[in-house]
Swiss-Prot record:
A Pfam family it matches: Ribosomal_S15
Classification via SMART domains: Ribosomal_S15
TM ranges: none
GO annotations of cellular component type: chloroplast; ribonucleoprotein complex; ribosome
Gene: rps15
Keywords recorded for this protein, A-Z: Chloroplast, Plastid, Ribonucleoprotein, Ribosomal protein
PANTHER family the record matches: RIBOSOMAL PROTEIN S15, BACTERIAL AND ORGANELLAR (PTHR23321), SMALL RIBOSOMAL SUBUNIT PROTEIN US15M (PTHR23321:SF26)
Record's protein name: Small ribosomal subunit protein uS15c
Gene source species: Welwitschia mirabilis
One GO molecular-function entry: structural constituent of ribosome
């Protein structure tokens, strides 16, 4: 498992690493939104990132089911 994580972190263009980076960004913005509830641009950014991550996960599911399972776990 750590071998795969190292491969993903070295290859920032891979779908798995993009999903991981989007997830980290969404979590960071969600924490920000917890303290700044009326930050509507942040809400919009989170929605856009969620849609992008959903599309990448769908692509990964169609192309590489093992990679999809690794990302989801």
């Amino acid at each position: 498992m750590t071998n795969m994580t190292n491969q993903i972190s070295n290859n920032t263009g891979s779908v798995q690493s993009q999903v991981r980076f989007l997830t980290d960004r969404i979590q960071k913005l969600s924490r920000h939104l917890g303290t700044h509830k009326k930050d509507f641009s942040c809400q919009r950014s989170i929605r856009k990132l969620l849609i992008k991550r959903k599309r990448l996960l769908l692509y990964l599911y169609k192309k590489d089911k093992t990679g999809y399972n690794q990302v989801k776990s």
